[in-house]
C-alpha cells in the first residue's frame, strides 16, 4: 500500500468528494439571498444580519432528518426530492414559531461517494431552500465505509430563521374560541414511514392501487413534503395568526396541542379534513384503526393555524389556496384533542 492511495484503499475516495463539491456549486448558487456572505467551501457559513430590517431580532433554529422515507428513496433509486423533504421538516418547524428562514446547512453521510447521486440529493436541498427563501450556506458530506453500506446514505439538516420579538408565536396568544384552519399537505410528508414500509413491504413501487387514482405507489410515497413558508410568513407579519402547528410525527394528537396552553383543547371536525387517497389506502391495507391514523399521520392537513374569528376572512383572502376550517379551540375537559 502506497501513501498515494492508502486512503482510497481504505474505502474513502477523496477525488469523488471533490467532484461532489464541484457538481453542487450551481445548485447552491440558486439559493443565494440577502445576507448570505462568502462562497461555498469555507470553514463556516456566514450570514450578515445587519442587512435585515428587524428591530428586536430573535433567532429560531430547527434540525431534522427525513426518517426512513430515505430508505424508500434508496430502494427506488430516486434521490432528487428527498433533500426537499429535509428542508421542509426544518423550515416548517421554525415558521411555526413565526420565524422567516434565513439559512440552511445539510449533512450527508454515506458509505461511498457517488457524485451523480449526491448531486441529486443536494439539488433537492437547494430546491427546498429556494421554496423557503433561505440560503444554503454550508454542509458536510462524510464518506464512512464500514459505517454505511455502499448504496446507503443518511441526510439531516439545520435551519436558522429570524423573527421580530413581538411576532414570536409561542402558544401564549391562542385562546378559547379561536378557529382552526388547515393548509393541505402534499402527501404523507416525512413521518410514519416505518409503518408505511411495513404496510407496503410486498407491494411493487410501480403498483397502481385503485385508491391512488392512477399514480404509481412509489411516486405517491416519495411525494416531497410541502413547504409552507410562502403561505404563512405574510400571515405572521400581518399579525393574523395566534398559533401554528406543524403536523409531523404523532399526527394531530401530538402536534396540535403544542401550540396552546394546557388548559385548552382542540375540537376537530373530521369531516372537514380533505383526507388524501394514500391515507385511505394505508388504513385499508395496513388494517390500522381509524382513530390511530390521527395519532400517526397528517391525514391531508400539514399545517394547522389558530386564528381569531374576526381574522379568518383576512387569512383566507391572503392565502392563495383553499383553506379548510377544521375546528376550534375549546376549554379542556379531558383530552387535548377531540376529534368529532
Curated annotation (Swiss-Prot):
Q: Which UniProt keywords apply?
A: ATP-binding, Cytoplasm, Ligase, Nucleotide-binding, Purine biosynthesis
**EC number, as in UniProt:** 6.3.3.1
Q: Which Pfam families match?
A: AIRS (PF00586), AIRS_C (PF02769)
Q: Which GO terms describe its biological process?
A: 'de novo' IMP biosynthetic process; adenine biosynthetic process
What InterPro entries does this protein map onto?
PurM-like_C_dom, PurM-like_C_sf, PurM-like_N, PurM-like_N_sf, PurM_cligase
Q: Which family does it belong to?
A: Belongs to the AIR synthase family.
Name used for this protein in its record: Phosphoribosylformylglycinamidine cyclo-ligase
- Give the organism, scientific name: Streptococcus suis
- Give the classification, highest ranks: Bacteria, Bacillati, Bacillota, Bacilli, Lactobacillales
Amino acid at each position: 500500500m502506497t501513501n498515494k492511495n492508502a486512503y482510497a484503499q481504505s474505502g474513502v475516495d477523496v477525488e469523488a468528494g471533490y467532484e461532489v463539491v464541484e457538481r453542487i456549486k450551481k445548485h447552491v448558487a440558486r439559493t443565494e439571498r440577502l445576507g448570505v456572505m462568502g462562497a461555498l467551501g469555507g470553514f463556516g457559513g456566514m450570514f450578515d444580519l445587519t442587512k435585515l430590517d428587524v428591530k428586536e431580532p430573535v433567532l429560531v433554529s430547527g434540525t431534522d432528518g427525513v426518517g426512513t422515507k430515505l430508505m424508500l428513496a434508496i430502494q427506488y433509486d430516486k434521490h432528487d426530492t428527498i433533500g426537499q423533504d429535509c428542508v421542509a421538516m426544518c423550515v416548517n418547524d421554525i415558521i411555526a414559531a413565526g420565524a422567516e428562514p434565513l439559512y440552511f446547512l445539510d449533512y450527508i453521510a454515506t458509505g461511498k461517494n457517488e457524485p451523480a447521486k449526491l448531486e441529486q440529493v443536494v439539488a433537492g436541498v437547494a430546491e427546498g431552500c429556494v421554496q423557503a427563501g433561505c440560503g444554503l450556506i454550508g454542509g458536510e458530506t462524510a464518506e464512512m465505509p464500514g459505517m454505511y453500506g455502499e448504496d446507503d446514505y443518511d441526510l439531516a439538516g439545520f435551519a436558522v430563521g429570524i423573527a421580530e420579538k413581538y411576532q414570536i408565536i409561542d402558544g401564549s396568544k391562542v385562546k378559547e374560541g379561536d378557529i382552526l384552519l388547515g393548509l393541505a399537505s402534499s402527501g404523507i410528508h416525512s413521518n410514519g414511514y416505518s409503518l408505511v414500509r411495513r404496510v407496503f413491504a410486498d407491494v411493487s413501487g410501480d403498483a397502481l392501487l385503485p385508491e391512488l387514482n392512477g399514480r404509481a405507489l412509489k411516486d405517491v410515497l416519495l411525494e416531497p413534503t410541502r413547504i409552507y413558508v410562502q403561505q404563512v410568513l405574510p400571515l405572521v407579519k400581518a399579525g393574523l395568526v395566534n398559533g401554528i402547528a406543524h403536523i409531523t410525527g404523532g399526527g394531530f394528537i401530538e402536534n396540535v396541542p403544542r401550540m396552546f396552553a394546557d388548559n385548552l383543547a382542540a375540537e376537530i371536525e373530521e369531516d372537514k379534513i380533505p383526507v388524501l387517497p394514500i391515507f385511505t389506502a394505508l388504513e385499508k391495507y395496513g388494517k390500522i384503526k381509524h382513530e390511530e391514523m390521527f395519532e400517526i399521520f397528517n391525514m391531508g392537513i400539514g399545517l394547522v393555524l389558530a386564528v381569531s374569528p374576526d381574522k379568518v376572512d383576512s387569512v383566507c383572502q391572503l392565502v392563495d389556496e383553499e383553506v379548510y376550517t377544521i375546528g376550534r379551540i375549546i376549554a379542556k375537559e379531558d383530552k387535548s384533542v377531540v376529534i368529532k
